[in-house]
A protein has these predicted regions:
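Feature marks short, surface-exposed loop/turn motifs that line or immediately flank catalytic pockets
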Residues: 17, 53-55, 115
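Active-site-proximal beta-strand elements of phosphoester/diester hydrolases
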Residues: 2-17, 46-48, 105-110, 145-146
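His/acidic metal-ligating clusters that form di-metal
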Residues: 21-105, 141
Length: 149
């Protein structure tokens, strides 16, 4: 893809854990990401990851989706060193959510399908099915959420 006259790159970060469904960003994963980002510092980069790397609330302690909050802090330190990151695309929480890390948007995609449940289901409590369409336009990252009617 193109970003102005520069090529862009995407990088996927494995946030899975063998211990729980919470995210894991250990030293090895963070060092690998940092190394990849150092290789192409002038190349606009989109980071794909399952667990959103941000606090999801204003509560104390903060609600997050990682085994411990320090993992998010360590990730943020790496992000601070790499201004070429233009967006973070995530999932996991099954609802649309947007935030920022520095100037880069963090976009959480809502579920592409309703959950398959056995027994009676209250569909009013389920998130809307949706998808996001991402594009570059006029040297900016654009995001549009399109919902199923």
């Amino acid at each position: 893809s193109k970003f102005g006259s520069l090529s862009s790159q995407s990088s996927s970060v494995d946030t899975s854990s063998q211990n729980s469904n919470l995210g894991l960003l250990n030293f090895s994963k963070l060092a690998h990401l940092d190394g990849l980002l150092r290789q192409k510092q002038s190349c606009p980069t989109i980071i794909f990851m399952h667990h959103p790397p941000i606090s999801l609330s204003n509560s104390e302690p903060p609600e997050h989706e990682y085994e411990n909050f320090r993992m998010i802090e360590n990730f943020a330190e790496i992000v601070d060193r790499h201004p070429q990151i233009i967006a973070f695309l995530c999932g996991h929480i099954h609802r649309a959510f947007s935030s920022h890390i520095n100037a880069s948007p963090v976009m959480v995609t809502p579920p592409p399908a309703k959950r398959l449940c056995r027994g009676a289901v209250d569909h009013a409590k389920m998130p809307e099915v949706a998808f996001r369409l991402h594009s570059f336009k006029e040297n900016a990252f654009k995001d549009t959420t399109v919902r199923d009617c």
